[in-house]
Amino acid sequence: MKKSLCALLLLILLPLGTTQATEFKLTGRTTWQLGQLMVNGMPFVIDDQTRFKDWLNEDDLGGTWVEMKGVVENGVRYVRKVEALDEDDKDEMDLEGPVEGGRIWGYTTSDNSLAPFEGRWLELECKFDGMRLSRCREDD
């Protein structure tokens, strides 16, 4: 009887202790500020679960153009995968994250194409001119 009651309590309480992680994806130039990895002024966390592609390592991240994938847990952005990108290939971006205040990951648009997605967390494909996004559309 005690075992089944404990198992039942565990099944009831277990979901309360779990947190939902939301995946993100962004492209941008990294910087280090006071020991914190930043992209567009937003902090990201590198930890023992972060994987670096090809030749890239943590020491290379200052000023490098990268694609980052990760999860947001309890408001903290954990990087899970980092890949260096060729600066010549940055005319298009695939982004996944929140559209808030006409921005996604700190990027604004030149054509207001983020407006239909305001308040949503989604995957987008956008053109990029080196400063601003344009022609953003939901990724298929």
Where are these regions (language model features)?
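Short, flexible, surface-exposed loop segments at domain boundaries
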Residues: 2-43, 48-140
